[in-house]
């Protein structure tokens, strides 16, 4: 098993704390494997197997657990009364009223509860109300490049590995596949499961074809300012009529399934959050390759996407910065401290001028905060 060190250490820190541990993230990003790693850790530190209860609600072994009461009774019968029980509930969100079972177990003093979900619905509505202040969310993503590299004994030829990471993506199981056709089939399976199971079925979307057209548009416009209005207008102009409200519903579903993340805009000088022209970033660049194939990519926006995901991994709130008429790619806020990032594939112009560099630095120089600028190509300036 590929050890997801940061996530594993987070679970260890919250072990035996009177909080429900909720691991969220897109399908196949490694949530179930994280549970297996943590269970191995528990057992190697003296926890008996009889004190560990794990249920994967997508396994046929547990299909008879169709409602919250049967789940509650099943687990309660297996609890050890004289010691702590570690309960792992994998993809429980499809059990109607599952929050009642979770709440019933939580009030017992000898239950340490861990749950996963592949849809933001898990923490919406009634569950969020019922468990308010009693859970911690651990937001999981596919592999960072650092985690991806950890799977290789040979750490040489980083450019080649990085190109593969960008092209085929960062889902952990990709590392087990060597043939491109197998990788594409695997990505197709993830895409279809997320779209058909987590979006179409849950949102009861009738026009799947139109949904896929919107998804294609989004995949092709990562890092561009986007709104439901401009998507609807763009598609209507090409005789694919769709309403603003339908696009809004689709975008909400894409965010809920964790296939996209949204970066709202922030006025740096006015110190206020803006509600228009947010940017959307993919959870995994490999999915773009699967859907759009060899269509030319804007590598600047792909690099932007990777930086955005890394900032999220490090616990930042991430916004797109506005400074007068200029833009800062990212305003990252961590513990109240702001850091500003400009991301460029290169700042070297073909005529050896510094126009691109000047343009990228202009909004940063207008901010009163101290700025450190790192250039990946020339180390630093």
Labelled PLM ranges:
Residues 1, 18, 24, 33, ...:
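A cross-kingdom feature that marks ATP-driven nucleic-acid transaction machinery
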Residues 2-16:
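Pre-Walker A adenine-sensing motif
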Residues 53-85:
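Short glycine-rich substrate-engagement loop in P-loop NTPases that contacts/grips substrate
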Residues 104, 121-137, 151-153:
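Short regulatory helix/loop adjacent to the ATP-binding pocket of P-loop NTPases
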Residues 142, 146-303, 309, 317-318:
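Interdomain hinge/linker elements that couple catalytic modules in large macromolecular machines
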Residues 80-98:
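Conserved P-loop NTPase "ATPase switch" module shared by AAA+ and STAND
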Residues 88, 112-118, 139:
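Structural recognition of the conserved hydrophobic beta-strand(s) that form the central parallel beta-sheet
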Residues 30:
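Conserved glycine(s) of the Walker
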């Amino acid at each position: 098993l590929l050890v997801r060190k940061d996530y594993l250490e987070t679970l260890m820190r919250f072990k035996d704390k009177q909080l429900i541990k909720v691991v969220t993230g897109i399908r196949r990003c490694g949530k179930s494997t994280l549970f297996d790693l943590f269970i191995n850790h528990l057992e190697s530190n003296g926890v008996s197997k009889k004190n560990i209860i794990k249920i994967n609600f997508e396994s046929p072994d547990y299909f008879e657990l169709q409602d919250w009461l049967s789940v509650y009774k099943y687990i309660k019968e297996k609890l050890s009364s004289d010691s702590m029980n570690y309960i792992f509930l994998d993809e429980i969100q499809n059990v109607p009223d599952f929050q009642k079972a979770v709440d019933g177990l939580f009030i017992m003093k000898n239950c340490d509860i861990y749950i996963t979900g592949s849809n933001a619905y898990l923490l919406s509505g009634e569950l969020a109300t019922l468990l308010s202040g009693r859970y911690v969310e651990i937001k999981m993503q596919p592999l960072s490049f650092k985690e991806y590299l950890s799977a290789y004994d040979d750490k040489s030829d980083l450019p080649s590995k990085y190109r593969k990471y960008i092209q085929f993506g960062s889902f952990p199981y990709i590392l087990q596949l060597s043939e491109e056709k197998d990788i594409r089939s695997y990505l197709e399976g993830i895409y279809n499961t997320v779209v058909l199971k987590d979006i179409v079925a849950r949102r009861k979307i009738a026009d799947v074809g139109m949904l896929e057209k919107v998804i294609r548009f989004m995949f092709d416009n990562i890092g561009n300012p986007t709104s439901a209005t401009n998507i609807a207008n763009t598609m209507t102009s090409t005789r694919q009529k769709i309403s603003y409200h339908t696009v809004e519903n689709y975008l909400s579903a894409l965010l809920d399934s964790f296939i996209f993340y949204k970066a709202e805009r922030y006025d740096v000088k006015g110190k206020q959050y803006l509600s228009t022209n947010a940017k959307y970033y993919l959870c995994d660049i490999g999915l773009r390759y699967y859907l759009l194939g060899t269509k030319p990519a804007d590598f600047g926006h792909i690099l932007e996407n990777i930086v955005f995901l890394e900032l999220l991994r490090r616990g930042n709130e991430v916004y797109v910065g506005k400074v007068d008429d200029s833009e800062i790619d990212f305003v990252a806020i961590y513990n109240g401290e702001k850091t500003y990032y400009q991301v460029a594939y290169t700042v070297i112009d073909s005529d050896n001028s510094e126009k691109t560099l000047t343009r990228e630095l202009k909004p940063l120089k207008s901010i009163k905060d101290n700025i450190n600028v790192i250039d990946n190509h020339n180390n630093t300036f």
